[in-house]
C-alpha cells in the first residue's frame, strides 16, 4: 500500500482505493495481495517484523479505511489476499511480544533456538497451546473483521524446518521427512488451513515455500498440509538475478529451461 504510489512519502489505504484499484481493475486482474498490513515498527522491514498482530498498520490510515479498500476491491470483482506473517515476530520489547510478561517463553521459543539467524527476529513456539490459540484467533480475526479472502503465509520454509532451510539443497527424501522437520509447525499449518476452509470453502491459502515440501498442497485427510497453492519464488528470483547480473548475450538457455520447468506438477503454483 505505502509503496504503490508515485508520490514522495508513504501512501494510504484511501489513496490506494481511489488511485490504484481502478488501474488494477482496468489491467484485468482479479486478485491482489496486500503486504505489510499488520502493525510493524520499522517500515524498512516491508512489514515482516510484526509487533501487533491484531492491528492494521496506522501509518497507512485507519482500520475503517482499510475495510473501505477491501470492500471497494470486492465491488470491482477483485479478491484481496493478506500477506500473513506467522513465521516470526519482531524482537522489540516495548512494542512487540518478546519479553511481554518478563520472560522469553510466553508464546516464543527461548534462547538461541528462539532467534532467527538471518532475520534477526523471534520465533514462535508452535508446541504451546497458548501460541496455537493466539495465531489461530489472529487468522480468524483478519477474515471476519476485515473480510479478507485468504492469506499468503510468509516464510513457510522457515517454519517447516528446525534449521529454517538455511543452506539445504532439498535433494533427498530425508531432507523433507527427517529429524530436521518441525512437526509442531506442520501441525499448526494444518490447523490453520482447516480453520480457514471451515470458515469458508472459498477462502484461499498460499504457502511461500522454496523447499518443495511434498504434500504442501495436498488435502489434510490425505496427509498433506492443506494449502491451496504454493508461491513459486524460484522463477521471479531467477529473472531478477539475470536482469541485474548478466548481459543478454550471456544468457544460458539451459538455466532458463531448468528454472521454468523445475516444479512439482501435481502442486498448484502461483
Short names for language-model regions:
Residues 147-149, 164-270:
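Conserved alpha/beta catalytic core and glycan-binding cleft of carbohydrate-active enzymes
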Residues 2-180:
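Substrate-binding/active-site clefts of carbohydrate-active enzymes
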Residues 1-2, 270:
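Active-site-proximal beta-strand elements of phosphoester/diester hydrolases
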Amino acid at each position: 500500500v505505502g509503496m504503490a504510489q508515485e508520490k514522495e512519502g508513504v501512501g494510504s489505504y484511501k489513496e490506494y482505493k481511489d488511485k490504484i484499484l481502478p488501474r488494477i481493475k482496468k489491467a484485468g486482474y482479479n486478485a491482489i495481495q496486500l503486504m505489510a498490513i499488520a502493525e510493524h515498527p520499522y517500515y524498512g522491514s516491508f512489514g515482516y517484523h510484526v509487533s501487533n498482530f491484531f492491528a492494521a498498520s496506522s501509518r497507512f490510515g485507519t482500520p475503517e479505511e482499510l475495510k473501505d479498500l477491501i470492500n471497494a476491491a470486492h465491488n470491482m470483482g477483485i479478491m484481496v489476499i493478506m500477506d500473513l506473517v506467522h513465521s516470526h515476530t519482531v524482537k522489540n520489547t516495548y512494542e512487540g511480544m518478546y519479553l511481554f510478561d518478563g520472560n522469553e517463553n510466553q508464546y516464543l521459543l527461548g534462547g538461541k533456538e528462539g532467534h532467527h539467524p538471518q532475520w534477526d527476529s523471534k520465533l514462535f513456539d508452535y508446541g504451546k497451546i497458548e501460541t496455537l490459540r493466539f495465531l489461530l484467533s489472529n487468522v480468524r480475526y483478519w477474515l471476519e473483521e476485515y473480510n479478507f479472502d485468504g492469506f499468503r503465509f510468509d516464510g513457510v520454509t522457515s517454519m517447516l524446518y528446525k534449521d529454517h532451510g538455511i543452506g539445504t539443497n532439498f535433494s533427498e527424501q530425508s531432507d523433507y521427512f527427517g529429524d530436521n522437520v518441525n512437526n509442531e509447525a506442520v501441525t499448526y499449518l494444518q490447523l490453520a488451513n482447516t480453520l480457514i476452509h471451515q470458515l469458508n470453502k472459498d477462502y484461499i491459502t498460499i504457502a511461500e515455500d522454496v523447499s518443495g515440501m511434498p504434500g504442501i498442497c495436498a488435502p489434510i485427510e490425505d496427509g498433506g498440509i492443506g494449502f491451496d497453492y504454493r508461491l513459486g519464488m524460484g522463477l521471479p528470483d531467477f529473472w531478477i538475478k539475470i536482469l541485474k547480473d548478466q548481459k543478454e548475450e550471456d544468457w544460458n538457455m539451459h538455466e532458463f529451461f531448468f528454472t521454468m520447468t523445475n516444479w512439482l506438477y501435481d502442486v498448484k503454483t502461483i
